[in-house]
Amino acid sequence: MCFTPDALPPRIPEDRVIPALAGGAAAERLTLESADGTSFVVALAECPDPVGGPAVIILPDVRGLYSFYVDLAERFVTAGYHALAIDYFGRTAGAEERDDEFDYMPHVMQTTPAQVQADIAAARDALAERTGATSFVTLGFCFGGAQSDLAGTNPDLGLDAVIAFYGMLSPERAGLDSPDFPAPLRSADKIVTPVLALYGGADPLIPPEDIQAFEAALTSNGVPHEIYSYPGAPHSFFDRSFDEHADASADAWRRVLDFLGKVEAGAVA
């Protein structure tokens, strides 16, 4: 898995928290319906006074929706953004809440990018209806980071950008060779939206040569992108319990919030 069940997202740097929103807003658990009729659960954190930038659709790691991502959605509210975290496994595990013993991998291996993108579309529509948002980005972690990258290949989703934290680029690095497992490096030439990608420099699952090849493909296709690797940081460094990586996490928050501002201004280079 990416994070332990008791992991917590790092706090947003204090100077990026909007004082009037510092108390945040509790996320609401909703059930949405995907295009194929699947019911799936999301956690919606609605900002009472948004800054006007894109709404954030959060794509979790291999465990699907759990407390880390609910908390993360609530964090975005304090910076002025609506955020909604989705669960992937409505088709195979139902919409009930799950405990820490949930055996997620059989469900991961049955989850296709097409299904995830259908759920993203439903999440986008729910955000538009509930909040009035008109622009959207995906933000994913690990498995969700790879799904976020691939969402950037689908112009029908109407995304303004995609963001990935240590999204695995070549799943064979982890011995995952399923044709349905997301492999952004093989699809990089099809990405059409701006990309922000953040990696741990000590992550054996995403070696420098994969990152370089991914960036080269984006550059070749003229896709605006920002890619950064944190020296010495592991996979899943974005965790409040990793004191030794607190600076990397704070910098990652700043890069994400700066990127959202650029997306709003149409200024991603």
Where are the language model's segments positioned?
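N-terminal cap/leader regions of alpha/beta-hydrolase-fold enzymes
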Residues: 1-269
